[in-house]
Amino acid sequence: MKRISIIIIAMLCSVAAFAQQQFDTDFTQTKVMKISGKTTEKAGHLVFDGNDHLTMTYSMPAGEYFIIEGNQVKINMDGKKADLDAEKVKMVQLQRATLLNCLSGNWEQAAIDNNAETSIAEANGLKTISIVAEGKVPKGGYKSVELTYRVSDGVLTRMVLEEAVGIINTYEIK
C-alpha cells in the first residue's frame, strides 16, 4: 500500500510540474489534410488563462480566430463562421475539453475523454506525451495527441492533434 501511495504521489508531482497554467504567446499552425495532401500554414497569437478561456487570433490569415469562453466556442476559420454552445453540441464539447485539458497540462483527462492510452518519452531536454486512441474514436475526438514540454520549466512548446477524419494540426508555441 505504501509503495502504491508513493507512486501516486510521484505521478501527481510529475503532472503538476508539467502543468502550464497560462499562455500569452505567438504560435504557428500547420494543417495537413491526409486525404488530399493539402497543407496550410497559419500563424497568430494565443492567450490562455489556465481555465476555460482560450483566444487564438490569426495574423496569417488575418481576421481568423478560434475562441473558447466558458462553454461558448466562436470560430472564424477557412471561410466558415460559427458560434457554438459546447453543452448542446457533444462533438464541440469533446474538442473544447481536449484542447483546454492539453493546454492546462491535464493530459490524463484528455486521454480518458478520447478513449486513449498514453506513453511518455524524454530526450534532449524535452518531455513528449503521446495520447493514442484505442478502438473507436469518440465523435469529435482525436485519434492521437502529442504534447511536447520543455523539461527545464514545464512549458508546452508543441501540440499535434490528429482528428479521426485525417486532419492533422501541429501547433508550435513560441
Predicted segments with their positions:
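Polybasic/polar functional segments that serve as interface/processing modules
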Residues: 21-35, 39-47, 59-60, 74, ...
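An acidic-aromatic
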Residues: 46-98, 169
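Gly/Pro-enriched, hydrophobic low-complexity segments
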Residues: 120-174
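Sec-dependent N-terminal signal peptides
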Residues: 6-10
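Positively charged n-region of N-terminal signal peptides that target proteins for export
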Residues: 1-4
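Short, surface-exposed coil-to-beta transition loops
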Residues: 40-43, 61-62, 69, 140-145, ...
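Flexible, processing/modification-adjacent segments and terminal tails
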Residues: 20-32, 38-39, 78-135
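N-terminal signal peptide c-region/cleavage motif recognized by signal peptidases
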Residues: 14-16
